[in-house]
């Protein structure tokens, strides 16, 4: 990859005012659904946040891209029968992209910027070059949160036979392990099973999902649960039904090639819980804002809200909508998600 691509990214990072930006990095292999999750989150967010005195103002380019991706997801439902449109869906990402959203009170200038960074999943696999791998490491180190999409059928079916191949948990573990060396400030890690409609509509599967995530990411979770990492990192499971009315319907026995079906011929695009990762992010930010410690990181978080108590209350109200019952779970770091607690 040409050096100028990396230089451009670093210039963008330098230009953004860190006092106003919460950065979230996607982390997952190619084809796992990182961009689909972002598009679904953006679409659902506008519908959910209307109930709070908050407004989201996507930067124009980000809105255009995610809207186009949402249209492609909607096209999956354009057929008359149960088989989705096989030509629709989202193509693999070919380059990195930052999706920026400004958050503020309705009718006021935005005071907080959320930045979600997506990139080709191939940049974390064994064929990636040293520049790509270093790029991802730099991004993870500079991010306040990491969002890890998980292909749920690969995790859940046939005792997780295809999980390692599809979700690459060892690659995810190694990158986070390297990125969080000598960590000194809190971080949030969100494990987000997607394409999980079949399992969340079946009580037996639903109860099994948390256990399967913990088993499938046992190296990562074990590493984060010791010493200073345990004290600094919050880890949550937040599944997202990215389509709503399309479910996993099987795969050939000899390879992972999943087939999906609409739940009914007139099924429609109706994602569910796709705002939950953002609710957890805001809950994390609100907890840090309440912390009175004077270290640089906590000061930066407090400066994001600029003493706007009205915005703080509205953001806090939105953040308290986090789901915590199974299959949602806080695995560690509850203290970094307790918005009622004040630091010392």
Feature map (PLM): residue ranges:
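Switch II of P-loop NTPase G domains
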Residues: 87-147, 155-161, 170-174
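Conserved G1/Walker A P-loop phosphate-binding module
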Residues: 2-116
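Residue-level preference for short coil/turn positions at secondary-structure junctions
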Residues: 20, 33, 141-142, 185
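C-terminal non-catalytic interaction/localization modules
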Residues: 5-9, 16-26, 46, 50-51, ...
């Amino acid at each position: 990859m040409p050096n100028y691509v990396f230089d451009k990214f670093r210039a963008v990072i330098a230009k953004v005012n860190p006092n106003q930006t919460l950065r979230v990095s996607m982390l997952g292999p190619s084809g796992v659904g990182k961009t689909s999750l972002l598009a679904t989150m953006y679409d659902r967010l506008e519908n959910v946040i209307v109930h709070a005195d908050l407004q989201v103002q996507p930067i124009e380019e980000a809105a255009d891209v995610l809207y186009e991706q949402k249209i492609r997801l909607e096209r999956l439902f354009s057929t008359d029968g149960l088989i989705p449109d096989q030509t629709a869906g989202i193509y693999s990402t070919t380059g990195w992209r930052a999706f920026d959203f400004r958050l503020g009170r309705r009718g006021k200038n935005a005071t907080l910027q959320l930045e979600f960074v997506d990139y080709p999943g191939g940049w974390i696999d064994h064929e990636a070059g040293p520049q790509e791998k270093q790029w991802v490491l730099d991004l993870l180190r500079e991010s306040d949160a990491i969002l890890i999409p998980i292909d749920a059928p690969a995790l859940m079916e046939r005792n997780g036979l295809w999980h390692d191949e599809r979700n690459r948990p060892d690659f995810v573990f190694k990158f986070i392990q390297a990125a969080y060396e000598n960590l000194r400030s809190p971080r949030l890690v969100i494990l987000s099973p997607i394409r999980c409609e079949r399992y969340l509509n079946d009580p037996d599967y639903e109860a099994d999902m948390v256990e399967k995530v913990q088993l499938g990411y046992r190296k990562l979770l074990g590493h984060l649960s010791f010493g200073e990492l345990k004290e600094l990192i919050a880890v949550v499971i937040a599944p997202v039904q990215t389509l709503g009315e399309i479910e996993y319907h099987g795969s050939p026995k000899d390879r992972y090639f999943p087939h999906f079906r609409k739940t009914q011929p007139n099924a429609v695009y109706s994602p569910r819980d796709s705002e939950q990762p953002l609710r957890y992010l805001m809950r994390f930010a609100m907890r840090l804002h309440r912390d009175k410690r004077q270290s640089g990181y906590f000061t930066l978080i407090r400066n994001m809200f600029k003493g706007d108590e009205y915005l703080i209350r509205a953001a806090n109200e939105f953040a308290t909508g986090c789901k915590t019952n199974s299959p949602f779970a806080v695995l560690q770091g509850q203290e970094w998600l307790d918005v009622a607690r004040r630091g010392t």
